[in-house]
Amino acid sequence: MHKQLPVICVAAGIVLLAACTNDGGQQQTTVAPQPAVCNGPTVEISGAEPRYEPLNPTANQDYQRDGKSYKIVQDPSRFSQAGLAAIYDAEPGSNLTASGEMFDPMQLTAAHPTLPIPSYARITNLANGRMIVVRINDRGLYGTDRVISLSRAAADRLNTSNNTKVRIDPIIVAPDGSLSGPGMACTTVAKQTYALPPRPDLSGGMGSASSAPAQPQGDVLPVSNSTLKSDDTTGAPVSSSGFLGAPTTLAPGVLEGNEPTPAPQTAPVSAPVTAPATATPVSAPAAAAPVSAPVSAPAAAASGRFVVQVGAVSDQTRAQQYQQRLSQQFSVPGRVIQNGAVWRIQLGPFASKAEASALQQRLQTEAQLQSFIASAQ
């Protein structure tokens, strides 16, 4: 009797082990990972904007398919998965998703066998490090070695193929909108906006619109050479007669045909004194007018409605170096904007969305960089 006891114990252990593995567990990670902890720099990612949504009552029940059992993930905070990704590329409107929505390949969505519907997850392309947020709104895949099926838009953003391995990290959205879960480790989610700036005030606003170019015209005044003091030696040629009709070199930003304007350019020359002096003389401070013209031009060029954001990092120095390199490579202005613990790297601003889109295309084709357009603030 005592000799048979070990045999019975071993047999019982085998039965228990088989019961633990015959559960469709291959669809989830074998060992539930611990809640993710950030030990590196924080990065800002884009994609579907997570928002609180009640779970679909019909799409979150345990089920069986093709002889396999699938258990819906009850605690996404302890779930993570890595494996090959498929591309779900059906025609728009051809079928409904498990959430009851019409499938749209241009939305950043995905299908997963066991994650809650609807829910959100951070998807990382393990080959190139790209990350986006997708919305889980469908079930699948079945009968393959793929762990998730991405929409065409999501696959293009991640630059995945049928042989690309990805990592799935859920993002949990609380009723108050706060985000947590493995997908938020070392990550902040960018809130994209394509809102246009407020409409200009047209009730008498025409005067304000014309005031910008009118200012430099009012500042450009004739100057008496007797009071002008300047160290600039790049003015008009010495051969200039100084007569109002004589050709002279125009200062930057000065309109041709404004005859009193060339007077400051002849200041370094002693010959043209009498003719400009006969014009309406003004005090010496007006000599600063030619300087204000070139300064106002870059200020106007730097204003715009749209910027192209290429990334965000937690190190300000790295962000500035990256922005300067991109600005030099693509010959566009740029800036680094702080947003909490991260520094956003933005190129622009641009006056129109078409200009920003053109830069987006160049970033994609020439540098293989993902970006998105946001309104300049």
Swiss-Prot record:
Domain of life: Bacteria
Signal peptide feature range: 1-19
PROSITE patterns: PROKAR_LIPOPROTEIN, SPOR
Keyword Ribosomal protein recorded: no
Lipid modification (S-diacylglycerol cysteine), residues: 20
One Pfam family named in its UniProt record: SPOR
Annotated Low complexity bias: 208-218, 264-277
Gene Ontology annotations of biological process type: cell wall organization; peptidoglycan metabolic process
Gene Ontology molecular function, alphabetical: lytic endotransglycosylase activity; peptidoglycan binding
Recorded topology in the membrane: Lipid-anchor
EC number: 4.2.2.-
Gene Ontology cellular component terms for the protein in this record: cell outer membrane; plasma membrane
Main location group: membrane
Subcellular location: Cell membrane
Keywords per UniProt: Cell membrane, Cell wall biogenesis/degradation, Lipoprotein, Lyase, Membrane, Palmitate, Signal
Entries under InterPro entries matching the protein: RlpA, RlpA-like_DPBB, RlpA-like_sf, RplA, SPOR-like_dom, SPOR-like_sf
Entry-linked CDD domains: DPBB_RlpA-like
Lipidated residues (N-palmitoyl cysteine): 20
Gene3D superfamilies membership: RlpA-like domain, Sporulation related repeat
Chain positions covered by the region annotation Disordered: 196-277
Domain SPOR, chain residue ranges per copy: 300-376
Job description of the protein: Lytic transglycosylase with a strong preference for naked glycan strands that lack stem peptides.
Family from the record: Belongs to the RlpA family.
Descriptive protein name: Endolytic peptidoglycan transglycosylase RlpA
Name of the gene encoding the protein in the UniProt record: rlpA
